[in-house]
Amino acid sequence: MLSQTNQNIFTVSRLNAEVRLLLENEMGIVWLVGEISNFSAPVSGHWYLTLKDSRAQVKCAMFRGNNRRVTFKPANGNQVLVKARLSLYEPRGDYQLIIESMQPEGDGRLQQEFEALKMKLAAEGLFAQTNKQPLPEHPKRVGVITSKTGAALYDILDVLKRRDPSLPVVVYPTMVQGEEAAIQMAQAIGRANSRDECDVLIVGRGGGSLEDLWCFNNEILARTIAASQIPIISAVGHEVDVTIADFVADIRAPTPSAAAELVSRDNSHKDQALVTHQHKLASAMRYYLAQQKQQSAQLMHRLERQHPSYQLQRQTQQLDELEMRLQRAMQRFITTRQQAVERKHHRLQLNSPVKRLAEQKSKLDRVEQKLLDAMDRKLLTMRHQLAIAAEKLDTVSPLATLKRGYSITQTEQGQVVTQAKDVKTGDVLVTRLSDGELRSTVN
């Protein structure tokens, strides 16, 4: 018989709660690219979806407070880039992602890769100030790794010629843009280290877009710079351009010309030393601020997990799940009832008295036709009788008498004059004929 302590025996709910906390605390924030499927937007305003690729899929939830910031309408089939934290939906034990931001895959992809690599290398200590090498106070030879046709090389050579013409320069020509550029620059750093012919290396180019400078965000190049035994100055773009190479190099110069000033001496070499220290201090401050920002983000993430809104989100997700289950149950009930009604209707049709009704209707139609025929005959007879009566009536009609040459004389008041004594001199008489009337005055 097995014997276990109470501490080793889990309930299902406790196990799911422990796994959820483990996922949320250990994994933190992740960036993920995938295709949307099973997208759902209930009345609660939250979004539920599945992110998948050709071999796997994961369920996701994006709560209303976060999806309001999404600038496009997601749909099944969209390729998206999401920022999310891992979690577990405890009621079902489903592993899921809680999405905090979403954008189409192409938008911001380079910036997200930049931030991810930056965090990775910082966590490994590649940006630590303790790993930085000091620049030689009096370099004997300077190596320049850049394009042999670019403006950066000519800017560096002009500054060195003006400030310290006797300082030897070794140029390691490479591409500084495109897919092969990072590998070429890493190989050039390796050659410079194996030859051991320079005291300091300048790696850089002129300004450009994020895509133009992307080769300086390459992980292989970054690790090669960090492993170099020769101090390296990163001089990429303009002062506002920042790359991974800037963080991992021993010192960052805002421009190629500034890098040349760092390795050359002139009458203001004391001021130059101050500039060097300022750059070191700025680099240290940037690293310190980056570390503090990362710690603040971690603390903020922990605080968000303990915020009541997080618990509300989980409860709302459970409510949405219950709502969807209720809808499915109602649909099944309605479907079952419809099928029962259809079966009863079919049985009723099999026993329908339609045929008998059709026969009775046929008989009724025949009776109706006979009745109509009888009515027609009766009407014909009555019309004939009416015509005969009309002829008889016409023979005694006053109008018929008028047509035979007779007339009727009346006073203006309409009284019929039948005798001469009925009128006097001056009376107006109206004599009605068959085709009109005459008016006359008695003299």
From Swiss-Prot:
Keywords: Cytoplasm, Exonuclease, Hydrolase, Nuclease. It is found in: Cytoplasm. Its main location: cytoplasm. The keyword Nuclease applies. InterPro entries: Exonuc_VII_L, Exonuc_VII_lsu_C, OB-fold_nuc-bd_dom. Pfam families: Exonuc_VII_L (PF02601), tRNA_anti_2 (PF13742). One of its GO terms (molecular function) is exodeoxyribonuclease VII activity. The keyword Cytoplasm applies. GO terms for biological process: DNA catabolic process. GO terms for cellular component: cytoplasm; exodeoxyribonuclease VII complex. Heterooligomer composed of large and small subunits. This is Exodeoxyribonuclease 7 large subunit.
